Amino acid sequence: MSRVLLVCPEPLGHGHPAGVGVRFVEIARVLLNDGHDVLVLSPDAGKVDGCRADHLSHESFAAHSVASDVAVVQGHVANAFFLHAKPVPTVVDLYDPFIIENMNYWAERGAEVFQYDHLTLMGSLVRGDFFLCASEAQRLFYLGLMVATGRLNPMLFERDPRLESLIRLAPFGVQAPRPLKPQSSHDILFGGVYDWYDPVRAIDVVARVRESIPDATLTFTRHPNPDITPQGKLAEAIGYAQKKRYDFVRFEPWAAYAERAEYFEKFALALLTFPRSLETDLSMRTRIYDYLWCGLPIVTSSAPGTDELLVRYHAGTVIHDDAVEHHADAIVSILRERATFDAMRTGAQQFVREHQWDRTLAPLREFCRAPRFEKTKELFASQPAITERPPSILDRLRRRLRA
């Protein structure tokens, strides 16, 4: 079996991983179960049971890459990895289209974020050997970029017209099925708030729901890594709830990963509201998988990836406009009609059975059994410079204030 090096950009030791951290934890578990020797690098050297762990650093990249058969990287940490690691077959996980997500932070952080995101993505596309993404829409998006960089080239196309040796679908997954507990509450979960969501609309939706179901509540959760994830929309939601004096809106800590099922099971239903954009066309919502895992029916704004799952498994209701009353009517209907509620929970259980991590990560498992360099990657692609972003003035000021 292979010696696998996982390069995770998010802390794991606090036990409260968000989407990227969760994905790396589950990748580690699946590859460990396959018999591989797994080493996880992260900012805090957080441990995953059965795997070795170390800190992210220039020295650890160099030392551990020499002793590895394959590496898996994601996001901006790829810059330092490709700069300091020794050559090793490298899987680049593109499930999170960060270059599109982070465009929401333009007003707050300026052009620097996009410039660095662009440099990171282009460098990763040129230097990676195999790529993972979460949906067919993402796959076409990244293939377009690969044509532009020269990674999708005539030699590769002639050998593999479907390009499955270059990029494959490996969406999020869920853990083993859980028995569903009886549910009688009217508590509604939104979850974490990122700047591409519309939490104020969600608050207005539940305010309208309360006209029919007076004990309905709405819960948001605070991000475990606020220093690396701007929280402008969360602040907006807090201010709006305070202004309206809504005591049914709650803001709670992020649930520990090992305890999140018990936390989610307190809720009757999940709600997601967001404006339609390229980000919604490309993203696959991590929380959708967890909510379905715990049997929560979902009412959500329309996004292609989410729509397809909820429709296929009859596990929720998709609202194709921004109307507060349409979201609210859907929630009231689900909570009041037990047959509809139970049918959606049954659909969620079917989803869980078909989206176990060992199935969704099958392309990665296959690559790790026989790692390889992509021999055509240097023949047509231009090599952009690799730059590790220096701390901005704002970043330095934040660190000084926290010290």
Regions found by a protein language model. Name each.
Residues 197, 256-263, 270-290, 300-308:
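Nucleotide-sugar-dependent
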Residues 162-163, 350-403:
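C-terminal amphipathic helix plus adjacent low-complexity
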Residues 312-313, 317-324, 333-338:
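Conserved acidic donor-binding segment of nucleotide-sugar-dependent glycosyltransferases
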Residues 1-45, 201, 208-211, 391-403:
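N-terminal subdomain of nucleotide-sugar transferases
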Residues 111-131, 139, 155-161:
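Membrane-proximal helix-turn-helix segments that form the acceptor-binding/catalytic region
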